[in-house]
A protein has these predicted regions:
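Radical SAM [4Fe-4S] cluster-binding motif and immediate context
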Residues: 154-318, 323-338, 366
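Conserved beta-strand positions
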Residues: 7, 73, 120, 219-221, ...
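Short amphipathic alpha-helical segments and helix-helix/interface helices
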Residues: 43, 84-88, 108, 131, ...
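Short, electropositive alpha-helical surface patch
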Residues: 63, 68-72, 234-241, 329-346, ...
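Radical SAM enzyme core and accessory elements
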Residues: 1-7, 12-16, 28, 51-54, ...
Length: 510
């Protein structure tokens, strides 16, 4: 009758924009930018009387000699390879291995036969059955979860997760998104009907994280503001809670869609509540590509102007951009470079369009005979499983390489940082020391060693922070992501050391 479990979040296959490998490379330490949410969420569903241990492999080695009788492994497609390695290793050691999470939910056949038990979909409604079967020695090969009522969700077991080396915690306030972007895999297993936790639940989770010393939290929603009435009620509760904190305010990040820019009152409330930065899927200035992908919420607006509204409200936008749509021709790289240069957005997540397994895009590309089924999306930012329509694969990769070198050039990045600062209002609630944190300062020193351009850019950045101490957290975060991006480009052999362009030299001389 097994009653001990080891829950693992595996290491990613390779560096990514918002991961933290650069911290190890700069000899700062091994810890994630954001703490894992899946492992403490699953831990909260384990019955009383069980022994529970959590491992986030981004911060510690997996204990292959654990005494736990059951091993549970979660993960996304980017963790696919490591999920399989760990499942095989623990089965060889006689452990009962469960596998679940987004990747298994979307592509269960990929882990079938490798793990003993597959948990497909959301675990909450089937957790009691799973653990009862395990205790009885009668675990099934597969369990399928439904769409649970999040108002019944237990508080994650953050007490089992060490926050000492994590920069931010997570609270999931909802699941699902009503939009239907054809490349989005989230809605394929979480659904298009958004489900929410009550504000009191969210505050309870924030209280727990605050007591553990956390002062930065990702509100891990697929679209935080899409249901305005619900978002307002929650933000009002968070604002009231945050004003009562006596050992520093909590700051927040989340994901929202560009249509939030049409609601300045909501954005103002978000900033007062403590929202600091937000991820937005901008994708492309190519309207035909937006139509093709059913990204309707980005149509019929001036995207750069809408991003400007979000900055003017006091938020740092983290903009997701994509090339490789069927309507993208060879000119898309210059179009994207010009568009991105116009944004007051230091943080750009630039990627090639990939068709995730289980999405409408995957089905369409497969039906058209343009799907590379050998590629699964876990390796390289210039890789894709889609054979493009209007250019060769070689042209797409070469164009992407030029594009990332342009937008992440240190001077071009600095221009976007300064555009962000110029467009940002003064926020007295964010006033602090006019200097970077210790981690940011050590990353800056590591970046400066790359060359004269980086050194000069950092001098301008430090001067900017002295002028605008209210922006230190946002600019500091931008610096962390920029350093991680440069590390990632080095890892993939994509960074080109080039002489400055005339435009860059003009900035240098300004």
């Amino acid at each position: 009758m097994p009653k001990s479990i080891y829950i693992i979040n595996p290491q990613e296959a390779a560096p990514y924009f918002f991961s933290s490998e650069v911290l190890s490379a700069a000899n700062i330490g091994r810890f994630p930018i954001v703490a894992d949410l899946a492992t403490p969420t699953v831990a909260a569903l384990v019955p009383e009387g069980w022994s529970i241990a959590i491992c986030d492999e981004r911060r510690e080695e997996v204990d292959l000699d654990t005494e736990a009788e059951v091993v549970a492994i979660t993960g996304k497609v980017s963790q696919r390879g490591r999920m399989k390695e760990l499942a095989r290793a623990f089965r060889q050691r006689g452990k009962l291995v469960l596998a679940g999470g987004p990747h298994v939910s979307l592509w269960p056949d990929d882990l079938r036969g490798i793990a003993d038990v597959l948990v497909i979909g959301e675990i909450e409604e089937v957790a009691a059955e799973i653990f009862a079967d395990i205790e009885a020695g009668a675990a099934k090969a597969e369990y399928r979860g439904g769409k649970p009522d999040l108002r019944l969700s237990p508080r994650p077991r953050w007490d089992l997760y060490r926050f000492r080396h994590s920069m931010a915690g997570q609270v999931q306030t909802s699941r699902g998104c009503p939009f239907e972007c054809d490349f989005c895999d989230v809605i394929q297993y979480l659904g298009r009907k958004q489900r929410w936790k009550e504000p009191a639940q969210v505050i309870d989770e924030l209280d727990q994280l605050y007591r553990l010393g956390c002062r930065d939290v990702l509100l891990a929603d697929d679209n935080f503001t899409v249901m305005r009435k619900r978002a307002r009620a929650l933000l009002e509760a968070i604002e009231a809670w945050n004003t009562l904190q006596t050992h520093g305010r909590m700051r927040f990040a989340t994901q929202l869609s560009i249509d939030a820019a049409r609601d300045p009152e909501l954005l103002g409330l978000a900033v007062r509540a403590g929202l600091d930065r937000c991820f937005i899927g901008i994708e492309t200035p190519n309207e035909e590509a937006l139509k093709e992908s059913l990204k309707r919420q980005n149509l019929r607006v001036d995207l750069a102007q809408e991003v400007g509204k979000i900055v003017a409200a006091g938020l740092l936008p983290l903009c997701g951009m994509i090339v490789g749509f069927d309507h993208d021709g060879p000119d898309i790289f210059d179009r994207q470079a010009r568009f991105i240069a116009s944004l007051p957005a230091p943080v750009i997540q630039m990627g090639m369009l990939v068709a995730p397994y289980g999405t409408p895009l995957w089905s369409r590309i497969k039906e058209e005979g343009r799907l590379d089924e050998e590629f699964c999306g876990e390796h390289n930012i210039i890789g894709s499983n889609i054979r493009p329509k209007l250019m060769s694969e070689a042209a797409l990769k070469a164009g992407m390489r030029r594009l990332v070198n342009d937008i992440y050039d240190p001077w071009n990045w600095l221009v976007r940082v300064e555009q962000f600062a110029d467009a940002s209002p003064l926020n007295i609630n964010r006033r602090g020391l006019a200097a970077f944190s210790l981690i940011e300062a050590r990353l800056a020193a590591s970046l400066a060693r790359r060359g004269a351009a980086e050194t000069a850019v950092l001098a301008r950045l430090e001067a900017l922070v002295r002028r605008r101490p209210d922006l230190v957290s946002q600019i500091g975060y931008s610096l962390i992501v920029y350093c991680q991006t440069r590390h990632m480009l080095d890892h993939f052999g994509l960074w080109d050391d080039r002489r400055p362009s005339p435009r860059q030299r003009a900035v240098m001389q300004a």
